[in-house]
């Protein structure tokens, strides 16, 4: 078996609603989740619906660059 890049990589998911709002008086931060993805099965950016504690609802979280 060839030794190479790891198949599973760590990614960070960020709430797109908080990012669009920018600095809002109600929102005190930006929701981020840390997870892993399989590089072979998901070559594109990961997009999941997760709970944002700052928006207080389920929103779309996209993968961001480190």
Swiss-Prot record:
Gene: rpl33
Family: Belongs to the bacterial ribosomal protein bL33 family.
Keyword Ribosomal protein among UniProt keywords: yes
Name this polypeptide is given: Large ribosomal subunit protein bL33c
Gene Ontology terms: cellular component: chloroplast; ribonucleoprotein complex; ribosome
InterPro entries: Ribosomal_bL33, Ribosomal_bL33_CS, Ribosomal_bL33_sf, Ribosomal_zn-bd
Any one of the GO BP annotations: translation
Gene3D superfamilies named among the record's database cross-references: Ribosomal protein L33 (2.20.28.120)
Single GO term (MF): structural constituent of ribosome
Keyword Ribonucleoprotein: yes
Compartments where located: Plastid, Chloroplast
Key words of the record: Chloroplast, Plastid, Ribonucleoprotein, Ribosomal protein
PANTHER family: 50S RIBOSOMAL PROTEIN L33, CHLOROPLASTIC (PTHR43168), LARGE RIBOSOMAL SUBUNIT PROTEIN BL33C (PTHR43168:SF2)
A UniProt-annotated Pfam family: Ribosomal_L33
